[in-house]
Amino acid sequence: MLEFLLRFFGRDTASSKKVAKERLRLVLVHDRAGVSPHLLESLKNDLIKVISEYLDIDTDGLEVSLTHENDAVALVANIPILRVKRTFKSVQEPAFKV
């Protein structure tokens, strides 16, 4: 009965626990990878800039995060594509050849 009342009045401890656990996991992943939130935000902005040369994307729906699995950290980007641009800047040849 108490659990029902807590859920009814908006104090769902199970979901609060999940949110807190996810936040802690994200903090630990960022800490282990040595990536600050500022660096991740800069990376996100650079990704938007580069990808926008080729595709129209939904920047509001774009998500960039770090995940940690088995001692490996991965950058995960979820980028909603609206359409492919038909014209884009041409890639220049490098000034020197190896």
From Swiss-Prot:
Pfam families: MinE. Signal peptide: none annotated. GO terms for biological process: cell division; regulation of division septum assembly. Keywords: Cell cycle, Cell division. InterPro entries: MinE (IPR005527), MinE_sf (IPR036707). Prevents the cell division inhibition by proteins MinC and MinD at internal division sites while permitting inhibition at polar sites. This ensures cell division at the proper site by restricting the formation of a division septum at the midpoint of the long axis of the cell. Belongs to the MinE family. This is Cell division topological specificity factor.
